[in-house]
């Protein structure tokens, strides 16, 4: 059976959060409470106390000040729910700017719904569709992540992805294929490249790391 999982940001308004969940029009089987400040812990405990008598509740503290670092943390948590076939809903009723933006990006990447309470009603906020990344490009992103986020040459990346460099004729095909994929990844903002002498260094961007967290 599909479970409905609510990812709820918590800042300082327990009553609004609880009301928004009740008014969302969706069932709730599990909740993740996310927060990013010491001051919010009190309200996290209050919301947890209310919801835990009804559903399973987990808490996720976002410890970074960066938006994409927060997105990676959220997606690593959300991914297991999506992979299990569950429906994920983001509730940004009580969000500061960073958490709100991180939730919006996470909802977009994971193709989840996002809602908020506005006055006496709850509204769903549409997110634009995100461009799909094929398996060949995902494997490049995974390889960069395994290497700590960067490699110092295309040859190194080919070795990581394909296992070895082929002889001259096949090698040229390998290099052309890798260059083609890297151009697409760079256009999508998932990697950046930098020429260093004869070599081309490749770096995973923060958005690229978020894709690996969700799809890698």
Curated annotation (Swiss-Prot):
This is Uncharacterized protein AF_1987. The lineage of its organism: Archaea, Methanobacteriati, Methanobacteriota, Archaeoglobi, Archaeoglobales. It comes from Archaeoglobus fulgidus (strain ATCC 49558 / DSM 4304 / JCM 9628 / NBRC 100126 / VC-16). InterPro entries: DUF6293_C, HFX_2341-like_N, WH-like_DNA-bd_sf, WH_DNA-bd_sf.
